[in-house]
From Swiss-Prot:
Gene3D superfamilies: Phosphorylase Kinase, domain 1, Transferase(Phosphotransferase) domain 1. This is Cyclin-dependent kinase 19. GO terms for molecular function: ATP binding; cyclin-dependent protein serine/threonine kinase activity; protein serine kinase activity. Its EC number is 2.7.11.22. Keywords: Acetylation, ATP-binding, Cytoplasm, Kinase, Nucleotide-binding, Nucleus, Phosphoprotein, Serine/threonine-protein kinase, Transferase. GO terms for cellular component: cytosol; nucleoplasm; perinuclear region of cytoplasm. It comes from Mus musculus. Residues 408-421 have a biased composition (Gly residues). The keyword Transferase applies. It catalyses: L-seryl-[protein] + ATP = O-phospho-L-seryl-[protein] + ADP + H(+); L-threonyl-[protein] + ATP = O-phospho-L-threonyl-[protein] + ADP + H(+).
Length: 501
């Protein structure tokens, strides 16, 4: 071995501590890493970055999978991995992301706190529409490229703060993401428990063997309902959960209490679910005879004949084969009536949400959100805390929470052809359709709020990712700022949550 050459390479290798200023700027902490708010020391740009240090030495298989995916995925609504640093001296791994100041978990918490303080301030409906549109746009891109996210929840949906991408949604935490083209084995054989419980589709709870893109759509429906009501639609107590068993009685009970028990005609294949015998044994259809999504949403002043409710109903369809797709949802009439969705979800208004607080290096890990079990994700990305939102009057400041970090999840590495080819961005037909005589403010082609549509901004790809993934069984974990996964407390009105990147 040429030790002189090796020493020369080590001297020339870029080191995180030489390039970025991040001391005292920790914004997240978790089981699998720390997240720092960072700036370049050389002043080449004034951008803020999220710098995630993965705990331990070396790089895990799950980290390899997330890094491989993130290096390939390029879309305005998917968090951008800027660079990976490998420290050969201490074998640390650092991931550099764009910094997002907010996430939906903190935004929703802000509005929930206003209700608790007797000064209710709902999320503006125009903001809800813009958030949902951009989430669907990002997921449509992932699905078009044969990627399932599999862990969508408010903490994994970041929103950019002040800057060039102000108010832009970023889907984060790809630690559980999976390529689903020609899997070698049924996905359920590899990691049977996927997606945080409150956002888990009923087919997963019933042990579906070959689940599909529909699991992400159900989770988006849950997020949509939470944006409309400021409460998790399917929250339930989640104690003593056996994560190796997909069936969870309390979670199914909560879903049926809101939606009603599915009729045979509404979900014909429910009898084929592996856990259907358990369902028959533990549940009685008559218990939920008076339950329906219509009644639940009417309590929150959402009319059953409104376009917002009709889209929610399509997203939360029990039968996954009848559930709407992301492409269909993007063309739903809900997005074609005023106010049209905007690229800046804050619509140019002042952002009332507080910025993320810095954590002390010796500050103990936050105790909140321990009661919401989820799959372990040994590697994840930091999400941004909630900060400022749209124009509504300033609500009383909620309890401030600090971001936590977690690792990445699951296990698959990039193999085969590697990530070099990149994604081909071809415009999907039909997604630029808007109502007659209406000028779109945002679309799959994206544009500045109120400005002309620029097709290059929001292009979708139907090409597959140019590499294969070998999958290991995924273990459960917490996550980092929207750049990873985190847990929510059953006391959802007062708990803190970690963020993801």
């Amino acid at each position: 071995m040429d030790y002189d050459f090796k020493a020369k390479l080590a001297a020339e290798r870029e080191r995180v501590e030489d390039l970025f200023e991040y001391e005292g700027c920790k914004v997240g902490r978790g089981t699998y890493g720390h997240v720092y708010k960072a700036r370049r020391k050389d002043g080449k740009d004034e951008k803020e970055y999220a710098l995630k240090q993965i705990e331990g030495t070396g790089i895990s298989m799950s980290a390899c999978r997330e890094i491989a995916l993130l290096r390939e995925l390029k879309h305005p609504n998917v968090i951008a991995l800027q660079k990976v640093f490998l420290s050969h001296s201490d074998r640390k791994v650092w991931l550099l992301f764009d910094y997002a100041e907010h996430d939906l978990w903190h935004i929703i918490k802000f509005h929930r706190a206003s209700k608790a303080n007797k000064k209710p301030m709902q999320l503006p409906r125009s903001m809800v529409k813009s958030l949902l549109y951009q989430i669907l746009d990002g997921i449509h891109y992932l699905h078009a490229n044969w990627v399932l996210h599999r862990d969508l929840k408010p903490a994994n949906i970041l929103v950019m703060g002040e800057g060039p991408e102000r108010g832009r949604v970023k889907i984060a935490d790809m630690g559980f993401a999976r390529l689903f083209n020609s899997p070698l084995k049924p996905l359920a054989d590899l990691d049977p428990v996927v997606v945080t419980f409150w956002y888990r589709a009923p087919e997963l709870l019933l042990g579906a063997r070959h689940y599909t893109k529909a699991i992400d759509i159900w989770a988006i429906g849950c997020i949509f309902a939470e944006l409309l009501t400021s409460e998790p639609i399917f929250h339930c107590r989640q104690e003593d959960i056996k994560t190796s068993n997909p069936f969870h009685h309390d979670q199914l009970d909560r879903i049926f209490s809101v939606m009603g028990f599915p009729a045979d005609k509404d979900w014909e294949d429910i009898r084929k679910m592996p856990e259907y015998p358990t369902l028959q044994k533990d549940f009685r259809r008559t218990t939920y005879a008076n339950s329906s999504l219509i009644k639940y949403m009417e309590k929150h002043k959402v009319k059953p004949d409104s376009k917002v409710f009709l889209l929610l109903q399509k997203l939360l369809t029990m039968d996954p084969t009848k559930r709407i797709t992301s492409e269909q949802a993007l063309q739903d009439p809900y997005f074609q009536e005023d106010p049209l969705p905007t690229l800046d979800v804050f619509a140019g208004c002042q952002i009332p949400y507080p910025k993320r607080e810095f954590l002390n290096e010796d500050e103990p890990e936050e105790k909140g959100d321990k009661n919401q079990p989820q799959q372990q994700n040994p590697h994840q990305q930091p999400a941004a805390p909630a900060q400022q939102t749209a124009a509504p009057p300033q609500a009383p400041p909620p309890q401030q929470s600090s971001a936590q970090t977690n690792g990445t999840a699951g296990g698959a590495t990039a193999g085969g052809g590697g990530a070099g080819a990149g994604l081909q961005h071809s415009q999907d037909p039909g997604l630029n359709q808007v109502p007659p005589n209406k000028k779109p403010r945002i679309g799959p082609s994206g544009a500045n709020s109120g400005g002309p549509v620029m097709p290059s901004d929001y292009q979708h790809s139907s090409s597959r990712l140019n590499y294969q993934s070998s999958v290991q069984g995924s273990s459960q974990s917490q996550s980092t700022l929207g750049y990873s996964s985190s847990q929510q407390s059953t006391q959802y009105h007062s708990s803190h949550q970690t963020h993801r990147y």
